[in-house]
Every structure is written in structure tokens, then in C-alpha cells.
């Protein structure tokens, strides 16, 4: 939907989020008479037309007091970001440039822009929950680094000295993992034998990865690493995951180096919201914000 859609009452809020599906939903919490809210309104409206792949909603904290309380709104304007009805981020204040940067950040490599029909109902692409600053990759080449495999484009991650890679992926809140996508080329350089570890207390090296018992070991086929491939995980073992360490031991064709075109995880957040990011301070009617 192009344009900002006002949410008229509390019962309307969840249906609007449901309608957004896996697309990014940007919700502006505003209040009548709030100067900063009025100042950023034209820019917010402009962004809704500039980024039609996202859904833009506006909630008045007095008209929808229950929604404001549930989402712990303590000041206006506050912008909350949702995907699959799950809150994934927030932005506070009337800085239009900062808000647009946040929107672009979430739309970059947007898993919601192309609906993944192979993702089971009730699960979602967890790319928005990956904390890129907390990720690490050992034995990546200088020319083809780790960031490349987090994007759906022609770039790729390639190993450097040999065929092995050791990747640590951090999440910004605990998640449950159902499966993963692990895409590679069909020239023999795609990954084959892979060990998956979760929630390691510290980084491991290649020697430790070789000798340690994984949470799950994978033997990927050429079909698994195609674009439409899904690699199932043992769901009961991946119920409260803060980080994943992926040890790629070998590739499909015993090639000198390994390439990964793209990977992501499918699952759900443990909680619908990351409450550590928010203080429960709800303004009363008539208070200044």
C-alpha cells in the first residue's frame, strides 16, 4: 500500500500488521499537538511513497491507548518496525534522515520483498534478526568476504587458504531455528560437509571445530544448495539460539576453495518483542512528550 494508513482504534492494529505479512511495517506513534510529530509528518508521508514495498501506519497514542501501552511508548514520535507481526526495531525522534536510514537498513536485502512460498506458515526469514556487527568469518578471502553471502546478488563468500570456513552468526535476540538456506554454485565449490554449533561461550578455531561434537552435522547435496533448496534442522535442538557457528569442512567437488552465494535461517523469535530494548513508561493523557 502506498501512503500512510491511520489506525483508528486498538482492535484495528493487529489486523493491519497481519495484512503486512512478511513485508516491513513502519508504525509511527504520534499525538495531536506534538510539534516534532507534525514536523516529521511530510517526510514520513514522502517515505511511504518512496518505499512502496513497505507498509506505513500511523497510531495516535490517545486514540489507541491500549496499543501504545502494549508497545511501551514513552515519547512521540516513536517509530516501531515490524515484520510478521514481530517487532524488530525502533527509532525515536523527528530526525527524518535518521529514520530513512533505518528504513533503508531494513529494506536492504529485504526477505519480504519476494514472498518465499517455500517458508512454512508460522515461520519467517530471520535475516532481519542477524546482528552483522557480531558476526565473524575465519579464512575468508580479501576479495570475497563474509558480507557478500548475506545479500541476494551476484557476489559470494569464498574461502582463502583452503576449502574450509568457520562462520559465527550472532542474533540480536534469541530465536528458534527451523531450517536454513545454504546456496552455492554448481561448479563443485559449494559447501558439502558442515557442522553446526550453537551458543558457544567463546570463539572456536579450526582445530576445535574439527574435534568437537556439533549440535547438528550436515551433508549437503547439490540440490540442497540450489536457490530453492531448504536444509532442515533438528528443531528441538535449536529452541533458544543466540549465536550459530558454522564449520564448513569441505565442498562438493574437492575444489581448492569453497564458495557460498547466500545463506539465511528460517524460524521465529523466542519472544514477540525484545523487551530489553524498551522501558515500560507510558505517558498519560495530557502529559507532555
Swiss-Prot record:
Its main location: cytoplasm. Keywords: Cytoplasm, Disulfide bond, Electron transport, Nucleus, Phosphoprotein, Proteasome, Redox-active center, Transport. Residues 2-109 form the Thioredoxin domain. Ubiquitous. It comes from the Eukaryota. SUPFAM superfamilies: Galactose-binding domain-like, Thioredoxin-like. Active thioredoxin with a redox potential of about -250 mV. Component of the 19S regulatory cap of the 26S proteasome. Interacts with PSMD14/RPN11. Interacts with, and reduces EEF1A1. This is Thioredoxin-like protein 1. The lineage of its organism: Eukaryota, Metazoa, Chordata, Craniata, Vertebrata.
Amino acid at each position: 500500500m502506498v501512503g500512510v494508513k491511520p489506525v483508528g482504534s486498538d482492535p484495528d492494529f493487529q489486523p493491519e500488521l497481519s495484512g503486512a505479512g512478511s513485508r516491513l511495517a513502519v508504525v509511527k506513534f504520534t499525538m495531536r499537538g506534538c510539534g516534532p510529530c507534525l514536523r516529521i509528518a511530510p517526510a514520513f508521508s514522502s517515505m511511504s511513497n518512496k518505499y512502496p514495498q513497505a507498509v506505513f501506519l500511523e497510531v495516535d497514542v490517545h486514540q489507541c491507548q491500549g496499543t501504545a501501552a502494549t508497545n511501551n511508548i514513552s515519547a512521540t514520535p516513536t517509530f516501531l518496525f515490524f515484520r510478521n507481526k514481530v517487532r524488530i526495531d525502533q527509532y525515536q525522534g523527528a530526525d527524518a534522515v535518521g529514520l530513512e536510514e533505518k528504513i533503508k537498513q531494513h529494506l536492504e536485502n529485504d526477505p519480504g520483498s519476494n514472498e518465499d512460498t517455500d517458508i512454512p506458515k508460522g515461520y519467517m526469514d530471520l535475516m532481519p534478526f542477524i546482528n552483522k556487527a557480531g558476526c565473524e568469518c575465519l579464512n575468508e578471502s580479501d576479495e570475497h568476504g563474509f558480507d557478500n553471502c548475506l545479500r541476494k546478488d551476484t557476489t559470494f563468500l569464498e574461502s582463502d587458504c583452503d576449502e574450509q570456513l568457520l562462520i559465527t552468526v550472532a542474533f540480536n535476540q534469541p530465536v528458534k531455528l527451523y531450517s536454513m538456506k545454504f546456496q552455492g554454485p554448481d561448479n563443485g565449490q559449494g559447501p558439502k560437509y558442515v557442522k553446526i554449533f550453537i551458543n558457544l561461550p567463546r570463539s572456536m578455531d579450526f582445530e576445535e571445530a574439527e574435534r568437537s561434537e556439533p549440535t547438528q552435522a550436515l551433508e549437503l547435496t547439490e540440490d540442497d544448495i540450489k536457490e530453492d533448496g531448504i536444509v532442515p534442522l533438528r528443531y528441538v535442538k535449536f529452541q533458544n539460539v543466540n549465536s550459530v557457528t558454522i564449520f564448513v569442512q569441505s565442498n562438493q567437488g574437492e575444489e581448492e576453495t569453497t564458495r557460498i552465494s547466500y545463506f539465511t535461517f528460517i524460524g521465529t523469535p523466542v519472544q514477540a518483542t525484545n523487551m530489553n530494548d524498551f522501558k515500560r513508561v507510558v505517558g498519560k493523557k495530557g502529559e507532555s512528550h
